Amino acid sequence: MAQDSQGQQQSLAKFAFNIYGTLGTPQSSNSPSANSSISSHKSSKRLSKNQLSNSYSRRLTYNAERDVQAIGQLNCGIQISHHISGNEPSHHAVIGGKNYLRLLCLNRDQQQVLQEIDLLDVKSIYRSRNPNKISSVNTIKTRENTIACGMSNGTISMYKVSPYGKGTLHAMLSDHRRTVNSIDFIDSTDHIISGSQDGSIKLWDLRASPTKPVFNLQANLHNDPIRACQYSPHSVVRNKTCILSVHDSGALCKFDLRSGSGSNMYSPDRKWNLHAGPVLSLHIHPEKEYVATGGRDHKICVFNYSEGRSLRTTPENIINTYGSILKVRWSSYLVNQGGRAGDGGGMGSMHTSTSFGDSTLALTNYDLACLYLNDDPTVTIYNLNRKYIPKQIINPYSQKAISNFMWAQNEIQGRRIWTLNKANQFMAYDLDSNFDTDIKRPLDDLPPIGMSWNDNDDFIWVNQAKDEFEANFESMCDDEQFLTDTAAAATATSTAFTASTSTNTAIAAERASSFDLEDHDHKMAGSSLGTSPIERPSLTRSYTHNPMSQFMTKSPSPILRSGTGVLDMTSPPSAGSALSTSTYTPRPKLARNPSQTTQGSAGSFGSTPASSSFAIKYKSGASGPGVSGVPGGPGVPGVPGGPIGGSLRLNSMVKSPFAFPVELPFNDEEAFKFLATEYLVTTPEGFTLADTCLMNASVAHEVGAYQSSQVWRVLAISLSDEKTMNAAAARMKTRTTLDNKNHVDEPDSANADHFNAATNMSATTDPNITAVSHTKHDQEEDVDSFALKSIQSDLDNVVGSYNSNSTLSIKYGRNINPLSSVSSHGIAYHGNDVHSRTNSMHHSRANSFNNTHSVRAGSSGADDHLSVHSQSNPLAIDSTTSKRGDYELENTNLMNSIFLRSSPNSIGFGSSRSYSSLASSPIDARRALPERQVPPEPLELNHDTSLILEKKQSNHSPKLPKRSGLSIALKNDDHHDCENDYEDGTEAWSFKSLLKGALEYAASQGEITFVSTIAILFYELARDIITFDQCLGWLGEYVEILQRKCLFVEATKIINFAPLDVAEKLKTLYAADTIRLYCSHCLKLLTNEKSKRQTHGEFGYWYCDECLQRQLNCVFCNEPCKGLVVAISLKCGHRGHFGCLKEWFIDEQNVECPGGCDVPIVV
């Protein structure tokens, strides 16, 4: 009695507290009443704008006295004492827990608890005689004024709430043996179903017998616990009573109560296994026969359980989450229905709710919220229109784990969620509010441009607009604002192709009038592509803004072609021109690679791709605009034969998202292994460094490393050039010394004529014609000068080909003769056929940059032609003066075969496939080549003689040719002298300059194979370019990579062939007695540091800590390879103990692998 009187006093105190209007003052924390965040509905109207902004950041919070875990909503009017009759609130909250069940009466805006009712403190015939018995409320379900509570002891309590807020215990149902997990009403408050942990679903008829169920359902004979069950209201139209349930076995079961016989059913009508593990929750869609299920497998499945899709076994949609799903619920209202104006309703503004015939549209019209299992403090809201990114996330500042939630119904049909956390707090969240800091919106923080990598080292980047994701264009065609923006975009597009500004204005006005857009001129200007760049976002402007539209110059109109969407016309159309576009079709796409560009085109790789077309239908008798980009069109007045009504296709200007996949050709494992194995790191016997570079160029070309191949060839030619020039300079120095020693005095004019004749190579190519006699010394000087000119021309060809836009075998419209390049690199011609040598060099020197500079001013046409051929003639050594051994001829044949097999874009090598076979000798290879189709021009004696006489009369000084303008520009005159240009090697195309540039670029690009090979080959030759630290760093990193890729033979080769001082350091770092074992599964180094730090267990390298797998057993004894034994890997991949393999191969004299793979091991 004392407790009852104390409770009455507290109720009177709270009643008086409410009467005198002090609800706005904060209540004491000791009081069990609610803590209200907003005083009343009237006082909230008097708040200022700043206070209103702060009030949105506060929410309704109620602190319960005991543990609560169940939540429900009672949707019936309750008369509160101080509210006027007929205006009572109709949405209230019900929370329950251990010996706790409260009804929280809320005000109309659900921002305040007006009254709380303890439903357990009622007198009834069903009340237990032991009031201190613990009974926990596990689930709550309400309908009208009835509250059903599923208890943890297996009973079901039914409460009735009167219009005056008085609760009574109406019935108690007890037939379950374990906890009741789910309750649902069937059409009325007289029939309910309940699912229990005992694996049964029971149907109760409160009118017949309140103590015994009328129907029992089980999924199978075994007791499969039921986590949730729900009645399907959509099956009533087919005269069925359908019940869905989910179980711990991961099954979704469908029962039809009207198809069973008797009062028990032990097998469902349909059963689907959608989850891999227990399913903890389900909820049926408010409009369609779809159900959402969530379980421990971190998935939310949306499944169509209708009769027409009963044979389907896979879900319609799957949402992958980061945790186990405890509860999943559909929203109560449409995503674009209700809410305050100006609030961020997420993507709801994009969806239309006018048509519910489409199931997909019905699914996206409702949001889906889920709660996670393992003490997670968040509630995540998804929408199937964008199921991979959460729409909103409720993440409380207190970070208290949420135990239950539900979608709350309200008068304004807003998106609100009620939650219960493990701090025993009831909290309300308004998802339509932009001022709640506990509600996160990932889409607002998501950048419009993103990129991602795949497993093949390729990446893709996406550019999209947030508000255009999967927008339904067909449903938007009925929207007046959408048509307005589309017409404005079409007007802006046609503006770029019209003849003048006046014409553009006329077309825009005509199209605007056809769309009835006179009242929306400002909207058209805002959405046009021709607006100021400042008014547009930077990311959008980067691929939609056309800078050419800013100029007022007259641009040509596009050529219109019939049948392809554009009509033929020869002149720019005027404003009143009439063009029939009744046969308009979208223009086909061009099959073009992303790397190919068109010069002068406005589009680029990052531009907007071709947009898809969509149909806009006009009413009969209404005129429509012209096709985008074409003046006039169907429905335009004045067009002969143009239809007034019908269908028109408009191209949308921007469609989102834009995906650009990019394939990167680097990090190719097979190419890396091939280059590491085939690259020559030392010069073979009988070859030179230039030959080694050419061989490496062929290796790089085979794997598609065309840039590296070209660099190797450039280095080879530059190296040969430098070697030849040094030899020529040495011979000239020797000749000068001999001349000074013998005191040979000749007239200055004779010396000048002699030097000019040697430099310009004016001597006739016919050995039978001798115009000027030379000594043997002079002939050697002529040969050296010829070599200088020939190699310089080769180098010019290399530079021009390397800097050109194309690296194909076609160079300036001419083919390259492979024999000319072979002869220019020191491979002699056998024979005295001067015409054949001249003809073979005609092609290889035709594109030389020195041709225009070699012809002397004032020469005749014949002299110019002769001068070109004479200067570009290669170094041709007669067979009588060339003395080669058999070994050198063998190397020549090998190099000849390499050159003939080289790539089409090789510099100076043959590319014809018909001559790619290995010839027995250079003579056989040359004989296999076809003769030149154009006959050679005969050499005339009078031209040659006149040229020589002219050179005799010149007064040139006997010195090297004057430097070109390119040499002066590329060379620093302050540090070098013009007389020794060919001696110091400081030109931009000198060997060391090219080597330095190639190393710097390759190192910046991470081409470790190239820089390491270069470092080994040219370390001794270019110590001033390749330092010791650079060489050691490159080779050390290269050896590390080779060992990581299990290329131990190649790694050892690099250490052995490294320079001496670098090799000593590498051998100390990578000693020969170091054994590194790699996992046979994940290919990672077996360090097993985790196991080494553990004190228990057996440590070894016969298992892997990274992938947690044991290594391969011995192929002979099938035991783990551990202990003090040696594991020997065979060619086939098997491994075994040293003793076992010794017994198999040595004692038993076997040659095949003991694993049965028949791979010969011992040969």
Curated annotation (Swiss-Prot):
GO cellular component labels: cytosol; GATOR2 complex; vacuolar membrane
Keyword Amino-acid biosynthesis: no
Molecular-function GO terms, alphabetical: zinc ion binding
Residue ranges of the region described as Disordered: 24-52, 525-606, 833-881
Disulfide bond positions: none
Biased composition (Polar residues): 539-556, 571-585, 593-606, 868-880
Compositional bias (Low complexity): 28-41
Gene Ontology terms: biological process: positive regulation of macroautophagy; positive regulation of TORC1 signaling
Family matches, as Gene3D superfamilies: YVTN repeat-like/Quinoprotein amine dehydrogenase
Zinc finger (RING-type): 1114-1157
Database matches in Pfam families: WD40, zf-RING_16
Alphabetical keyword list: Metal-binding, Repeat, Vacuole, WD repeat, Zinc, Zinc-finger
SUPFAM superfamilies: WD40 repeat-like
Subcellular location: Vacuole
InterPro entries: WD40/YVTN_repeat-like_dom_sf, WD40_repeat_CS, WD40_repeat_dom_sf, WD40_rpt, WDR24, WDR59_RTC1-like_RING_Znf, Znf_RING
Primary localization: other
Ranges for the WD repeats: 129-169, 175-214, 221-265, 274-313, 346-392
Family the UniProt entry places it in: Belongs to the WD repeat RTC1 family.
Function: May be involved in a process influencing telomere capping.
Name of this chain's protein: Restriction of telomere capping protein 1
